[in-house]
Amino acid sequence: MGKSNSLPSAGRYNANYGNFQSELYAQIRHEAFGEDIGQNSWLTSDEQDRFLQWLDLSPGKTLLDVACGAGGPALRIAAITGCSVIGIDVHEQAVRTASSLAAQRGLAERAEFRATDASGPLPFSDASFDAITCIDAINHFPDRPRVMAEWARLLKPS
């Protein structure tokens, strides 16, 4: 048996999100992905741009980013499209980092981040969002049909 990591899994995520803004992490993202859009996944800017065409976001529209992590992709969407973003993540350190990045990038008025467990009912009214994204995290939800039904409740018609 190998030696177990002394940090519980949430602690490992918190450590990652706590270091997210460091120059080293930015360099790693740039070397791994060829660019740094603040991603915690293999999503590239080209892929995100294709999704943005489908989502048709613009000023006055609102995006919910589920499992937003440190907020990099959501903040890029807000900057490019002019839409408002609400990002939710179960990890409080991720939310703190995302909020800090929003302030640094001058997006705090249009980008809000909350520590919320997205596996249960979400604290938003019906038809609150024009689009919902969840980048590389749907696999973390054991009851995906229930999660999708909740997202359907939150989406505006059309």
Spell out what each predicted region is.
Residues 31-41:
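Class I SAM-dependent methyltransferase Rossmann-like catalytic core
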Residues 62-66, 70-120:
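Class I SAM-dependent methyltransferase SAM/SAH-binding core
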Residues 1-31:
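N-terminal, positively charged/glycine-rich alpha-helical extensions of SAM-dependent methyltransferases
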Residues 145-157:
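A short glycine-rich, Lys/Arg-flanked "PGG" loop and its adjoining helix->strand segment in the class I
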Residues 131-143:
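A short SAM/SAH-binding and catalytic strip from SAM-dependent methyltransferases
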Residues 41-59:
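Conserved alpha-helix/loop element of class I SAM-dependent methyltransferases that forms part
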Residues 120-132:
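A short acidic, Gly/Pro-enriched loop at the edge of an enzyme's catalytic core
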